[in-house]
């Protein structure tokens, strides 16, 4: 994407609605016209009514919603997006949540911006792979700084695409995970 695109793929229900992100993006947009003009939020998948309501603060041309996209086409959106948004459910068990989405995002090799527990399992994966940043559910200051740093990188990198120097992502490829699961099942059965 030529724009500063932030893309989320999949269901975004009420406990996965990153209200803090919408607030921060709106604050930055209201004080930085270049950011406002560059920002694109792409949401692919079913959205809770609360999410739709929260997004009304943005200009119509800032938001792109696609209710359904065939899985084979999702990869194109992920690979072309500047940033992939991973929003962990804000629930008591959030530290242990690892969505399947994180593994698909890793394969896209785009920067991941996650909102969730900074000491959770998803945070550990992002740290081990150098594939992105996780910001706590209520850490508005860190989220704003992260977005502004990503935006600065986007503006500085004139070829138009942000990239990550991820490492060790092969261990999270679905073939490897399936193989590891098969080994566990074999051990349990025998």
What are these regions (language model features)?
Residues 75, 100-108, 123-124:
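Short alpha-helical segment that forms part of, or immediately flanks, the ligand-binding pocket
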Residues 138-142, 155, 159-187:
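A charged, aromatic-enriched C-terminal amphipathic alpha-helix characteristic of glycosyltransferases
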Residues 1-16, 22-25, 177:
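Conserved donor-binding/catalytic core segment of Leloir-type glycosyltransferases
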Residues 60-64, 78-95:
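Acidic donor-binding loop of glycosyltransferase active sites
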Residues 32-45, 49-75:
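Nucleotide-activated donor-binding/catalytic signature segment of Leloir-type glycosyltransferases, i.e.
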Residues 83-87, 104-116:
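Short hydrophobic beta-strand element within catalytic cores of glycosyltransferases
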Residues 19-35:
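Short hydrophobic signal-anchor/transmembrane segments that target glycosyltransferases
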């Amino acid at each position: 994407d030529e724009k500063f695109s932030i893309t989320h793929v999949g269901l975004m229900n009420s406990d996965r609605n990153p209200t803090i992100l919408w607030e921060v993006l709106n604050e930055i947009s209201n004080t930085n016209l270049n950011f406002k003009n560059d920002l694109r939020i792409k949401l692919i998948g079913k959205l809770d009514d609360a999410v739709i309501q929260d997004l009304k603060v943005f200009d119509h041309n800032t938001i792109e919603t696609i209710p359904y996209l065939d899985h084979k086409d999702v990869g194109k959106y992920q690979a072309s997006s500047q940033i992939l948004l991973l929003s962990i459910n804000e629930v008591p068990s959030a530290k242990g949540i690892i969505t399947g989405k994180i593994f698909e995002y890793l394969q896209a090799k785009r920067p991941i911006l996650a909102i969730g527990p900074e000491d959770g399992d998803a945070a550990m994966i992002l740290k081990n792979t150098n594939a992105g940043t996780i910001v706590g559910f209520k850490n508005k200051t860190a989220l704003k700084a992260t977005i502004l740093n990503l935006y600065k990188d986007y503006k500085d990198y004139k070829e138009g695409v942000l990239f990550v120097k991820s490492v060790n992502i092969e261990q999270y490829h679905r073939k490897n995970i399936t193989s590891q699961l098969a080994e566990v099942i074999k051990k349990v059965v025998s």
